[in-house]
Amino acid sequence: MPSNTTASSGHKSGKKKGRRARLVVIVLVLAIVGGIGFGAYWSISTVRASFPQTKGTIKLDGLSGPVDVKRDGNGIPQIYAESDADLFMAQGYVQAQDRFWEMDVRRHMTSGRLSEMFGKSQVKTDEFLRTLGWHRVAKKEYDSKLSPETKKYLQAYAKGVNAYLAGKDGKDISVEYAALGFTNDYEPQKWTPVDSVAWLKAMAWDLRGNMEDEIDRSLMTSRLGPSQIKDLYPEYPYKRNKPVVREGAYDGVTKEYDAKGAATGTQTGAGGTGGTAGTGGTGGTGGTGGTAGSGLAGGAQAPNGLQSQLSGVSDALDEVPAILGPNGNGIGSNSWVVSGEHTITGKPLLANDPHLAPQLPSVWYQMGLHCRSVSDKCQYDVSGYTFSGMPGVVIGHNQKIAWGMTNLGADVTDLYLEKFTGDGYQFDGKVLPFTSREETIKVAGGKSKKITVRETNNGPLISDRNDELVKVGKKAHVDTAAPDRGDGYGVALRWTALNPGKSMDAVFDLNKAGNFKEFRKAAALFEVPSQNLIYADKDGHIGYQAPGRIPVRGKGDGSLPAPGWDPEYRWKGYIPQNALPYEYDPKRGYIVTANQAVIDDSDKAKYPYKLTSDWGYGARSQRIDDLIRSKTENGGKISTEDMRLMQMDNSSEIAKLLVPKLLKIDVKDKYVREAQKLLEGWDYTQDADSAAAAYFNSVWRNILKLAIGNKLPKELRVKGQCLNVEPAGNTGPADEGKKVRECGQRDADSAQPDGGDRYYEVIRKILDDETNDWWKAPATRTDKETKNRDQLFARALEDARWDLTAKLGKDVDTWSWGRLHRLTLKNQTLGTEGPGWVQYVLNRGPWNLGGGEAAVNATGWNAAGGYGVVWVPSMRMVVNLKDFDKSKWINLTGASGHAYNAHYTDQTEKWAKGELLPWAYTDKTVEKGTSDKLVLRP
């Protein structure tokens, strides 16, 4: 998103005026935020004008009774009301006080209207977002799917937001509006209930599953053969890394999942078992149980036209704002629950830490919503983490139950190559007309732009949003059996979130659920995004439910793009909710979910449906499992502090595997040997001050680059990495004279190999095969070719030494992982990718962090792109079901979205150290911790 708002100017005065406008914005922001005299008007008071009133009384038309807003020393509000409508109206008012700029940017993103705020620089992004149509689907949900009660709450929330906005200029709402006002005349508009619903679509997009893997597998075929692609998508290691659900089975008679049952033999009548091996195309298997032969490319080289289309789609995806974070292997969340049998309190403990992109302010907003007396008139007494712009609590607890979430990772998207003929597309031997609509994109400081969005029976044509793709599609050569050429090809997206659903109903039902039955009933409505839901209650029960709208496929397993003209590849429906896996009070006494496989679906007798071909590979989940078992063996008990320490576990699973091998390498160079010795006696923990962790992670990065990265096509490699390679598709003998120079095309956050736990499994499988072809790397001007594992390891040890010498200095004793692995928090829009002074004023950091890729303390980095932190535990919580007031929580930043407010980043230092804050819940404890009290009166 732009930080230089001068891009919104549509005048013809050229670069000089753009530079002048940019200087105005920079000077203005500095003047406002720093309190530099810019006339009487632009004084420090302009900054403080947008700070919320947190004491005294405010009259709020529309309330039926008084509402108390009690804030603790961190500015976290607890709201007390006598009716549901008053409660959610107050929630809207308070969140707008602290976070309206964030809310406004989000709703412009979800509706494809960023250009209205930031000008022509965002037109391409808006075109893609309009094509996806998040806001259109959200409106359909609101109009036709949501319950009357949910609509009432959404309306009350919107009323509260608008009550805050009433009579205020932009500069009174947030300092960013004051800066924006010098480049265009944008003014915030009223909030609508649909604005809140649309945020769930944005969530679903960033948590959509395996679409990038689907693209990558096809793009790999230009450089890799079927067996090589299979190597890079190994089977899930069920025996070593346990799935979430280990008890129960699908009942072939009742067609339901039975948490206490056993498989009843061959399953039939499951409505089609998507993911049947080897259907369509040719070639072997790929993905975690998926097939490389289940779509257009099969196991052979993807046709040139398909590769061009998918490369363009990948580029278009990079342009869409990453709301929650990068979408790839190793990214996800941790949540686990331990029954009272294994805890000091005798009641369950539940932990959760979702891994998302670092944002300022945090994507989460801590809040309590309390009815003074719970009744039919006022049903809620809930506390936890909310999203600014959306009523209710997303993760947290009420007076009876607690719940957490991690990304299920279900495959809910498919790409279809569509065959065009005239003004239509081919399907089942016929030409069908496109469904089309016209969209008008308004541009701040410029002319509006009209676009046409076309859809097939599979979904919107996302390839239309790339001019180059339109040209390529007309000339595409497609080898796969297809109808006559006609007028080219395009790529359509089918995605479960583009069908209206009831996920907003689920939020409110979760907030008032009182037992596991009510929890599961609410979970059944949580259709998108598909999340692992973990559960505990005051009565001592623990549980888990896999919800979501997950497709059942005919041919294909979703691991590769499918031919849109073939009806056999259409979805056949969705997995019934009562057939989705769950657990309730498992015998082992705990449940761990950290994006690993939900269930062993390789055994069709136990479970006939395919949830995905692309699970996370379970490095984090198994480490958590091991920590729980080690703590509870011989009757040991787990405390809240133990749960916190588990969340901060920095252990590197891949280091445990590789370091013994690396220490056996005979290193000749004394400076490289000096670095190698850092690994001797290392305990494999990636603390911020660890020199060994810094060196190992650099070695790991170089192993991946030499063994895998340099063999990938340019479409997957990081931008700026240029190699001399054989021409793509070359089948003749190697010829140095014919090599061409190819440079990577991927953004650093999404390039491959990213170093996630999929690559742990790739390297694990070939580690003992010392002459495997993956260990072979060509010679360079300074290095000899490597012909085996130890030669490649020696080269990686050397390359890492010089890499860190350049970055951290010659003296290895001064090295530390945290100096490489740094977190900078960037304010939305004005704090990202913009002029340095503006970033300096609005951003915070850096912090030197421990943890790493696929560690439990998952401070993620992309090995192809660098060492910097690209996703984090966006919050951490531990819920104590014995005494909610002894629960703990922390947010990445603070409650406020206002730069220089005391609560802008007041939790970040504690978060970085792994500390947690007290989490008050009962009236007495909240009152004791109250620093500010605001009364909202009708």
How would you label these PLM feature ranges?
Residues 2-5, 10, 25-26, 31-349, ...:
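Substrate-recognition/specificity elements adjacent to catalytic centers across diverse enzyme folds
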Residues 698-804:
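Charged, long alpha-helical assembly modules
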Residues 526-631, 685-688, 699-713, 720, ...:
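Hydrophobic alpha-helical segments
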Residues 87-90, 128, 136-152, 494, ...:
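Second-shell loop/turn segments in exported
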Residues 1-21, 434:
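Terminal targeting segments of Actinobacterial cell-envelope proteins
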